[in-house]
């Protein structure tokens, strides 16, 4: 599958012109991650966005320790959720600049596009309309995730 199709299907390139989609594909790099490999680690400072388009990833997070750094517990990270193909990970760190909140590990052979933070920010800032459309699309994706999490929480609390 080509980069443009992946970006359109995941929603990041929705409502973009062909020229804008080309800008996005020009900075996207394809990567393959074998089972067990880490795409990003909890507490890392990186801000790249990944678009998973084949395979499954697991989100792992260490349990918190009162008054300690998030990774200071020494306990084994726990699985949080599984994301299927065409899912976006890393968007929160891109937006707020904070460290990664979870480790993302390939559960099988994973293929992903990577949008490097520095190049993405550069093209978003150089074309305000493009930047607006991209951020609007990213917000729509985040809203879907929050709504899904709210439903899961509601189902968990009221069952």
PLM feature spans:
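Cytosolic regulatory regions built on CNB/CRP/Popeye-like sensor folds
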Residues: 1-159
């Amino acid at each position: 599958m080509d980069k443009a199709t992946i970006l359109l299907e995941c929603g990041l390139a929705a409502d973009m012109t062909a020229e804008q989609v080309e800008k996005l594909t020009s900075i996207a790099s394809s990567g393959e991650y074998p089972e067990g490999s880490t795409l990003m680690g909890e507490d890392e400072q990186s801000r790249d966005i990944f678009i998973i388009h084949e395979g499954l990833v697991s989100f792992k997070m260490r349990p918190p320790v009162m008054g300690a750094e998030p990774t200071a517990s020494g306990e084994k990270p726990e699985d949080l959720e599984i994301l299927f193909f065409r899912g976006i990970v890393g968007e929160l760190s891109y937006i707020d600049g904070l460290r990664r909140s979870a480790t993302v590990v390939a559960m099988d052979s994973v293929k992903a596009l990577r949008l490097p933070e520095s190049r993405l920010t550069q093209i978003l800032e150089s074309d305000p309309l493009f930047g607006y459309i991209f951020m609007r699309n990213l917000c729509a994706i985040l809203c879907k995730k929050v709504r899904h999490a709210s439903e899961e929480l509601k189902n968990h609390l009221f069952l």
